[in-house]
Amino acid sequence: MELSESVQRGIQTLADPGSFDSNAFALLLRAAFQSLLDARADEAALDHPYLKQIDPVVLKHCHAAAATCILEAGKHQVDKSTLSTYLEDCKFDRERIELFCTEYQNNKNSLETLLGSIGRSLPHITDVSWRLEYQIKTNQLHKMYRPGYLVTLNVENNDSQSYPEINFSCNMEQLQDLVGKLKDASKSLERATQL
């Protein structure tokens, strides 16, 4: 597992008994799993009276580091021994390693389901519609007399089977630029498929 320096510092702070005693560690670890797996979870998990004695900046940094470590472990489908070895390298004691690994094993299936539901591909444009919007005056004192275009792209997301819309407004130059870039992309795709 490759984690950034900032995340590693947060994990090492979490491992330090001087910063987090065993009760605070357990509460923060559960809060990290809860914030990832429960859509209704909010920051109230960090408002536990036992965590009030910890500097809020350190608390949030360690919470984010723990959540990142959990997500990376789930992403790479890390087993207990690999996670244990990583936590040992981060100066965790045996008790904290055991608690972290137990929480991870208990929530591993939910975590993998969550990560599996995240899309892996970009949406595909299936249709486009537009309408002319003519601005006569803005909130400024001068008049504008220039057309604008309201564009709606209908897209299909293969991973979630949903059909959302992307709406935006642009002026004539921006629309011409968009059309030119789409034509260039189409030609590039045609050349790539012919190779």
From Swiss-Prot:
The keyword Cell membrane is annotated on this UniProt entry: no
Record keywords: Cytoplasm, Ion transport, Nucleus, Sodium, Sodium transport, Transcription, Transcription regulation, Transport, Ubl conjugation pathway
Domain of life, per lineage: Eukaryota
GO annotation, biological process: sodium ion transport
Cellular-component GO terms for this entry: cytoplasm; nucleus
Domain called COMM: residue spans: 124-193
InterPro entries: COMM (IPR017920), COMMD3 (IPR037355)
Subcellular location: Cytoplasm; Nucleus
Subunit structure comment from the entry: Component of the commander complex consisting of the CCC subcomplex and the retriever subcomplex. Component of the CCC (COMMD/CCDC22/CCDC93) subcomplex consisting of COMMD1, COMMD2, COMMD3, COMMD4, COMMD5, COMMD6, COMMD7, COMMD8, COMMD9, COMMD10, CCDC22 and CCDC93; within the complex forms a heterodimer with COMMD2. Interacts with NFKB1/p105. Interacts with CCDC22, CCDC93, SCNN1B, CUL3, CUL4A, CUL4B, CUL5.
Family affiliation: Belongs to the COMM domain-containing protein 3 family.
Role, per record: Scaffold protein in the commander complex that is essential for endosomal recycling of transmembrane cargos; the commander complex is composed of the CCC subcomplex and the retriever subcomplex. May modulate activity of cullin-RING E3 ubiquitin ligase (CRL) complexes. May down-regulate activation of NF-kappa-B. Modulates Na(+) transport in epithelial cells by regulation of apical cell surface expression of amiloride-sensitive sodium channel (ENaC) subunits.
Name this protein carries in UniProt: COMM domain-containing protein 3
Species name: Mus musculus (Mouse)
